Design a protein with these regions (language model features):
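C-terminal engagement/docking regions of AAA+ P-loop ATPases
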Residues: 42-43, 48-51, 251-309
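Short glycine-rich substrate-engagement loop in P-loop NTPases that contacts/grips substrate
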Residues: 79-113
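Structural recognition of the conserved hydrophobic beta-strand(s) that form the central parallel beta-sheet
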Residues: 119-120, 156-163, 245
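AAA+ ATPase "lid" subdomain C-terminal helix
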Residues: 32, 221-229, 239-257, 268-276
Protein backbone atom coordinates (compact mmCIF):
# COMPACT_ATOMS: atom_id res chain seq x y z
CA UNK A 1 0.00 0.00 0.00
CA UNK A 2 1.36 3.42 -0.97
CA UNK A 3 1.83 5.69 2.02
CA UNK A 4 -0.24 8.86 2.05
CA UNK A 5 2.83 11.09 2.35
CA UNK A 6 4.68 9.39 -0.52
CA UNK A 7 1.65 9.60 -2.79
CA UNK A 8 1.16 13.33 -2.19
CA UNK A 9 4.87 14.07 -2.63
CA UNK A 10 5.51 12.02 -5.76
CA UNK A 11 2.37 12.66 -7.81
CA UNK A 12 1.96 15.78 -9.91
CA UNK A 13 -0.95 18.22 -9.94
CA UNK A 14 -2.14 18.22 -13.54
CA UNK A 15 -4.66 20.17 -15.56
CA UNK A 16 -3.43 23.70 -14.79
CA UNK A 17 -0.41 25.28 -16.48
CA UNK A 18 1.98 27.32 -14.36
CA UNK A 19 0.95 28.21 -10.79
CA UNK A 20 3.95 26.29 -9.40
CA UNK A 21 3.95 28.21 -6.10
CA UNK A 22 0.23 27.54 -5.53
CA UNK A 23 0.65 23.85 -6.38
CA UNK A 24 3.47 23.48 -3.85
CA UNK A 25 1.43 25.27 -1.17
CA UNK A 26 -1.53 22.97 -1.81
CA UNK A 27 0.68 19.88 -1.60
CA UNK A 28 2.19 21.17 1.63
CA UNK A 29 -1.25 21.62 3.19
CA UNK A 30 -2.65 18.29 1.97
CA UNK A 31 0.44 16.47 3.21
CA UNK A 32 -0.61 17.42 6.75
CA UNK A 33 -4.32 16.94 5.96
CA UNK A 34 -5.00 20.61 6.56
CA UNK A 35 -8.12 22.36 5.29
CA UNK A 36 -7.52 25.10 2.71
CA UNK A 37 -9.34 28.02 1.12
CA UNK A 38 -8.03 28.88 -2.35
CA UNK A 39 -8.58 32.60 -2.96
CA UNK A 40 -8.49 34.22 -6.39
CA UNK A 41 -10.47 35.99 -9.11
CA UNK A 42 -12.78 33.98 -11.38
CA UNK A 43 -11.54 32.21 -14.47
CA UNK A 44 -7.99 31.40 -13.33
CA UNK A 45 -8.44 27.65 -12.92
CA UNK A 46 -9.27 27.28 -9.21
CA UNK A 47 -11.91 24.62 -9.81
CA UNK A 48 -9.74 22.69 -12.28
CA UNK A 49 -6.85 22.80 -9.83
CA UNK A 50 -8.94 21.52 -6.93
CA UNK A 51 -10.41 18.70 -9.03
CA UNK A 52 -6.93 17.40 -9.76
CA UNK A 53 -5.97 17.24 -6.07
CA UNK A 54 -7.80 13.97 -5.44
CA UNK A 55 -5.32 12.31 -7.83
CA UNK A 56 -2.58 13.01 -5.27
CA UNK A 57 -4.22 10.74 -2.72
CA UNK A 58 -3.60 6.98 -2.53
CA UNK A 59 -6.42 4.44 -2.70
CA UNK A 60 -8.42 3.97 0.49
CA UNK A 61 -9.87 0.89 2.15
CA UNK A 62 -13.67 0.81 2.00
CA UNK A 63 -15.20 -2.36 3.44
CA UNK A 64 -12.06 -4.34 2.61
CA UNK A 65 -11.78 -3.08 -0.97
CA UNK A 66 -9.16 -0.58 -2.18
CA UNK A 67 -10.83 2.22 -4.14
CA UNK A 68 -10.09 5.75 -5.31
CA UNK A 69 -10.75 8.32 -2.59
CA UNK A 70 -14.02 10.23 -3.00
CA UNK A 71 -14.23 13.75 -4.38
CA UNK A 72 -17.47 15.46 -3.38
CA UNK A 73 -18.45 18.94 -4.53
CA UNK A 74 -20.64 21.39 -2.64
CA UNK A 75 -21.74 24.57 -4.41
CA UNK A 76 -21.96 27.56 -2.08
CA UNK A 77 -25.41 29.11 -2.14
CA UNK A 78 -27.79 30.96 0.18
CA UNK A 79 -30.16 28.01 -0.36
CA UNK A 80 -27.68 25.44 0.97
CA UNK A 81 -28.92 23.86 4.21
CA UNK A 82 -27.35 21.96 7.08
CA UNK A 83 -29.30 18.90 5.93
CA UNK A 84 -27.52 19.08 2.56
CA UNK A 85 -24.18 18.82 4.33
CA UNK A 86 -24.94 16.60 7.30
CA UNK A 87 -27.94 14.60 6.13
CA UNK A 88 -31.48 14.00 7.34
CA UNK A 89 -34.00 11.38 8.41
CA UNK A 90 -35.42 9.34 5.54
CA UNK A 91 -39.18 9.00 6.24
CA UNK A 92 -39.45 5.53 4.66
CA UNK A 93 -36.46 4.27 6.65
CA UNK A 94 -37.83 5.89 9.80
CA UNK A 95 -41.02 3.86 9.41
CA UNK A 96 -39.03 0.68 8.85
CA UNK A 97 -36.33 1.09 11.51
CA UNK A 98 -37.78 3.72 13.83
CA UNK A 99 -37.04 7.47 13.81
CA UNK A 100 -34.30 7.16 16.44
CA UNK A 101 -32.40 4.41 14.64
CA UNK A 102 -29.16 5.39 12.88
CA UNK A 103 -30.38 3.23 9.99
CA UNK A 104 -33.07 5.85 9.31
CA UNK A 105 -30.42 8.48 8.71
CA UNK A 106 -29.45 9.40 5.13
CA UNK A 107 -25.92 10.84 5.17
CA UNK A 108 -25.17 14.19 3.57
CA UNK A 109 -22.23 15.25 1.47
CA UNK A 110 -19.66 15.54 4.25
CA UNK A 111 -19.99 11.83 5.02
CA UNK A 112 -19.80 10.90 1.35
CA UNK A 113 -16.42 12.68 1.32
CA UNK A 114 -15.01 10.55 4.17
CA UNK A 115 -11.35 9.64 3.48
CA UNK A 116 -11.29 11.97 0.48
CA UNK A 117 -11.77 15.61 -0.49
CA UNK A 118 -14.79 17.82 0.10
CA UNK A 119 -14.69 20.64 -2.44
CA UNK A 120 -16.69 23.66 -1.24
CA UNK A 121 -16.92 26.01 -4.21
CA UNK A 122 -17.61 29.66 -3.33
CA UNK A 123 -17.30 28.98 0.37
CA UNK A 124 -17.73 32.70 1.04
CA UNK A 125 -21.42 32.22 0.27
CA UNK A 126 -21.68 29.93 3.29
CA UNK A 127 -24.17 31.19 5.89
CA UNK A 128 -23.31 31.58 9.56
CA UNK A 129 -25.50 28.58 10.39
CA UNK A 130 -23.56 26.38 7.97
CA UNK A 131 -20.26 27.66 9.32
CA UNK A 132 -21.34 26.61 12.81
CA UNK A 133 -22.47 23.23 11.47
CA UNK A 134 -19.00 22.59 10.04
CA UNK A 135 -16.98 23.70 13.07
CA UNK A 136 -17.14 20.41 14.98
CA UNK A 137 -16.48 18.35 11.85
CA UNK A 138 -13.44 20.38 10.82
CA UNK A 139 -11.92 20.18 14.29
CA UNK A 140 -12.81 16.64 15.40
CA UNK A 141 -13.33 14.86 12.05
CA UNK A 142 -16.60 13.54 13.47
CA UNK A 143 -20.18 14.78 13.54
CA UNK A 144 -22.94 14.27 16.08
CA UNK A 145 -26.31 14.01 14.38
CA UNK A 146 -29.32 15.53 16.13
CA UNK A 147 -30.46 13.39 19.03
CA UNK A 148 -28.36 10.36 18.07
CA UNK A 149 -25.74 9.39 20.64
CA UNK A 150 -23.37 8.12 17.97
CA UNK A 151 -20.53 10.12 16.41
CA UNK A 152 -20.23 9.57 12.67
CA UNK A 153 -16.78 9.67 11.03
CA UNK A 154 -16.25 12.55 8.61
CA UNK A 155 -12.52 12.45 8.01
CA UNK A 156 -12.03 14.52 4.88
CA UNK A 157 -9.86 17.38 3.64
CA UNK A 158 -11.97 20.45 2.88
CA UNK A 159 -10.76 22.58 -0.01
CA UNK A 160 -12.78 25.76 -0.42
CA UNK A 161 -12.58 28.43 -3.09
CA UNK A 162 -13.62 32.04 -2.96
CA UNK A 163 -13.52 35.10 -5.16
CA UNK A 164 -12.37 38.15 -3.16
CA UNK A 165 -14.22 40.48 -5.53
CA UNK A 166 -17.63 39.04 -4.66
CA UNK A 167 -19.51 39.72 -1.44
CA UNK A 168 -20.55 36.79 0.72
CA UNK A 169 -24.02 36.19 2.07
CA UNK A 170 -22.54 36.56 5.54
CA UNK A 171 -18.93 37.26 6.49
CA UNK A 172 -16.87 34.18 7.26
CA UNK A 173 -16.23 34.30 10.99
CA UNK A 174 -12.75 34.39 12.47
CA UNK A 175 -13.54 31.17 14.35
CA UNK A 176 -14.46 29.45 11.08
CA UNK A 177 -11.48 30.81 9.12
CA UNK A 178 -9.16 29.70 11.94
CA UNK A 179 -9.77 26.12 10.74
CA UNK A 180 -8.21 26.89 7.34
CA UNK A 181 -4.99 27.87 5.65
CA UNK A 182 -5.41 30.53 2.94
CA UNK A 183 -3.65 30.17 -0.42
CA UNK A 184 -3.83 33.04 -2.88
CA UNK A 185 -3.95 32.36 -6.62
CA UNK A 186 -3.31 34.98 -9.30
CA UNK A 187 -3.82 35.06 -13.09
CA UNK A 188 -1.18 33.34 -15.28
CA UNK A 189 2.32 34.52 -14.41
CA UNK A 190 3.36 35.40 -17.94
CA UNK A 191 2.02 36.02 -21.42
CA UNK A 192 3.73 32.82 -22.58
CA UNK A 193 1.85 30.69 -20.03
CA UNK A 194 -1.45 32.38 -20.85
CA UNK A 195 -0.83 31.70 -24.55
CA UNK A 196 -0.11 28.05 -23.75
CA UNK A 197 -3.42 27.86 -21.85
CA UNK A 198 -5.30 29.33 -24.82
CA UNK A 199 -3.65 27.03 -27.36
CA UNK A 200 -4.33 23.98 -25.18
CA UNK A 201 -8.04 24.44 -25.95
CA UNK A 202 -7.27 23.17 -29.49
CA UNK A 203 -9.77 25.50 -31.16
CA UNK A 204 -8.62 25.89 -34.75
CA UNK A 205 -11.59 27.01 -36.83
CA UNK A 206 -9.27 29.29 -38.81
CA UNK A 207 -5.63 30.34 -38.47
CA UNK A 208 -4.87 32.84 -35.68
CA UNK A 209 -1.47 34.44 -36.43
CA UNK A 210 0.97 34.05 -33.56
CA UNK A 211 1.88 37.75 -33.39
CA UNK A 212 -1.76 38.80 -33.39
CA UNK A 213 -2.55 36.27 -30.66
CA UNK A 214 0.31 37.61 -28.53
CA UNK A 215 -0.98 41.15 -29.00
CA UNK A 216 -4.52 40.06 -28.13
CA UNK A 217 -3.34 38.39 -24.92
CA UNK A 218 -1.16 41.41 -24.17
CA UNK A 219 -4.19 43.68 -24.54
CA UNK A 220 -6.15 41.63 -21.98
CA UNK A 221 -3.19 41.60 -19.59
CA UNK A 222 -2.92 45.38 -19.97
CA UNK A 223 -6.57 45.71 -18.95
CA UNK A 224 -5.87 43.37 -16.04
CA UNK A 225 -3.37 45.94 -14.74
CA UNK A 226 -5.50 49.00 -15.50
CA UNK A 227 -5.95 51.42 -12.61
CA UNK A 228 -9.25 52.52 -14.19
CA UNK A 229 -10.92 49.18 -13.43
CA UNK A 230 -12.18 47.70 -10.19
CA UNK A 231 -13.08 44.40 -11.88
CA UNK A 232 -10.54 42.97 -14.30
CA UNK A 233 -10.84 40.43 -17.14
CA UNK A 234 -9.90 36.83 -16.42
CA UNK A 235 -8.42 34.13 -18.63
CA UNK A 236 -12.00 33.31 -19.65
CA UNK A 237 -12.06 36.69 -21.42
CA UNK A 238 -8.89 35.82 -23.32
CA UNK A 239 -10.34 32.47 -24.35
CA UNK A 240 -13.58 34.17 -25.37
CA UNK A 241 -11.86 36.62 -27.70
CA UNK A 242 -9.68 33.84 -29.12
CA UNK A 243 -12.80 31.86 -30.00
CA UNK A 244 -14.98 34.73 -31.18
CA UNK A 245 -12.29 36.27 -33.39
CA UNK A 246 -12.00 32.93 -35.18
CA UNK A 247 -15.79 32.77 -35.55
CA UNK A 248 -15.84 36.28 -37.00
CA UNK A 249 -13.17 35.38 -39.54
CA UNK A 250 -14.97 32.18 -40.50
CA UNK A 251 -18.27 34.02 -41.01
CA UNK A 252 -16.41 36.48 -43.25
CA UNK A 253 -15.14 33.49 -45.28
CA UNK A 254 -11.56 34.27 -44.24
CA UNK A 255 -8.92 31.67 -43.52
CA UNK A 256 -6.92 33.92 -41.20
CA UNK A 257 -7.96 36.12 -38.25
CA UNK A 258 -7.09 39.81 -38.57
CA UNK A 259 -7.28 42.77 -36.16
CA UNK A 260 -10.82 43.66 -37.25
CA UNK A 261 -12.07 40.22 -36.22
CA UNK A 262 -10.53 40.71 -32.77
CA UNK A 263 -11.98 44.21 -32.49
CA UNK A 264 -15.46 42.98 -33.39
CA UNK A 265 -15.34 40.52 -30.48
CA UNK A 266 -14.12 42.96 -27.81
CA UNK A 267 -17.42 44.51 -26.68
CA UNK A 268 -19.43 41.30 -26.57
CA UNK A 269 -16.77 39.36 -24.68
CA UNK A 270 -15.40 42.04 -22.35
CA UNK A 271 -18.12 44.58 -21.52
CA UNK A 272 -19.66 42.51 -18.70
CA UNK A 273 -16.33 41.08 -17.53
CA UNK A 274 -14.87 44.41 -16.45
CA UNK A 275 -16.17 47.16 -14.20
CA UNK A 276 -15.07 50.78 -14.32
CA UNK A 277 -14.15 52.57 -11.13
CA UNK A 278 -16.83 55.01 -9.90
CA UNK A 279 -14.63 57.99 -10.78
CA UNK A 280 -14.68 56.92 -14.43
CA UNK A 281 -18.04 55.28 -15.05
CA UNK A 282 -19.88 58.60 -14.87
CA UNK A 283 -17.58 60.03 -17.54
CA UNK A 284 -17.75 57.22 -20.11
CA UNK A 285 -19.48 53.92 -20.69
CA UNK A 286 -17.77 50.55 -20.57
CA UNK A 287 -18.14 50.28 -24.35
CA UNK A 288 -16.48 53.68 -24.88
CA UNK A 289 -13.67 52.73 -22.52
CA UNK A 290 -12.97 49.46 -24.34
CA UNK A 291 -12.98 51.08 -27.77
CA UNK A 292 -10.60 53.80 -26.61
CA UNK A 293 -8.25 51.30 -24.99
CA UNK A 294 -8.27 49.11 -28.08
CA UNK A 295 -7.66 51.99 -30.49
CA UNK A 296 -4.92 53.52 -28.35
CA UNK A 297 -3.23 50.42 -27.03
CA UNK A 298 -3.54 47.55 -29.48
CA UNK A 299 -0.15 47.58 -31.13
CA UNK A 300 3.03 45.59 -31.56
CA UNK A 301 4.36 46.57 -28.13
CA UNK A 302 1.69 44.60 -26.27
CA UNK A 303 3.36 41.26 -26.88
CA UNK A 304 6.53 42.57 -25.26
CA UNK A 305 4.88 44.25 -22.26
CA UNK A 306 2.36 41.63 -21.25
CA UNK A 307 4.30 39.70 -18.63
CA UNK A 308 2.69 41.30 -15.59
CA UNK A 309 -0.36 39.33 -14.39
Amino acid sequence: MVKFEESVKNKEISGVLGQDYVKKQLKSAILMRRHVVLVGPPGIGKTTLVRSLVNLLPEVDVSGEMVKPPFVRVQGSPDLTSEDLIGDIDPSKAIKYGPMSPSAFTPGKIFKADKGILFFDEINRCSEKLQNTLLQVLEEKKATIGSYEIDFDANFILIGTMNPEESSTEPLSDVFLDRFDMIYMKPPESLAIEKEIILSKNINLVKFPDKLLSNTIGFIRKLRNSSDLEKHPSVRATIGIYERAQSNAYLDSKDVVDVKHVQDAIISVLSHRIRLKPSLKYVKTTTEFLREEFNQGFNDDLADNGDSP
